[in-house]
Amino acid sequence: MEKTILVGLVNRNQDHKKCQEYLDELEFLSFTAGGTVAQRFTQRIENPNPATLIGKGKMDEISTFVKAMDIQTIIFDDELSPAQEKNISKILKIKVLDRTNLILDIFAQRAKTSYARTQVELAQCQYLLPRLRGMWTHLERQKGGIGMRGPGETEIETDRRIVRDKIALLKSKIKTIDKQMSVQRGNRGKLIRTALVGYTNVGKSTLMNSISKSSVFAEDKLFATLDTTTRKVVIGNLPFLLGDTVG
């Protein structure tokens, strides 16, 4: 398990109680992603620091804890700008995530079908694009050559173009899969379609298994289900299609 710490903000829009509720959920998300929370940090701040979100004093406190406890990852409940993410990483020298990034990581772990994996990859690329500056990326760095703009192109321009090309490719792939799924839905005839909806981890997949007598994957973790599953169900001589939704 990866040792993590959580950071939440208290302000006029979010009191201490609400902040703790969000951190409770963030801790569950961290556990789902494979992390164990060593400590939570909160700060009352009305005007977040544009460079690091939190104030210098709180950052120093966190930095001391990170070094003493050998923390690997810091997770912010609030959305970080690309600049804030970069600055915090420079100061703490550990992995920096926000809630969005953490959820995308869980999605990447949980996606099973080609459609779900493609959607997650698209979301990750769209999240990554504005954050490329100053980051070491896993993307292949090429300058010049067939299909590349030319030897004068900078590394960051190359990375951005590769990500944009990838986004276009993924969108095209999703469009193709959507067409295929539309044909499949048409082939199911005129059966009534229903869906189980609700917040993540409330028991939709468990209820689906009970009603349809099937074995849809269910687990006591957030976002255990990422792929929609449809089953034919008959209740009181009425046949219909029941779908399990994301969460």
Which residue stretches match the model-derived regions?
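Short alpha-helix plus adjacent loop in nuclease-associated cores
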Residues: L102-V120
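N-terminal accessory targeting/assembly segments
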Residues: M1-D105
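Conserved phosphate/pyrophosphate-binding and hydrolysis machinery centered on Walker-type P-loop NTPases
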Residues: H16-C19, T52-K56, D78-E79, A111, ...
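Flexible beta-alpha connector loops of hexameric P-loop NTPases
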Residues: N13-K17, N49-T52, R110-S114, E155, ...
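A residue-level signal for conserved active-site and pocket-lining positions in enzyme catalytic cores
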Residues: L26, C125, V163
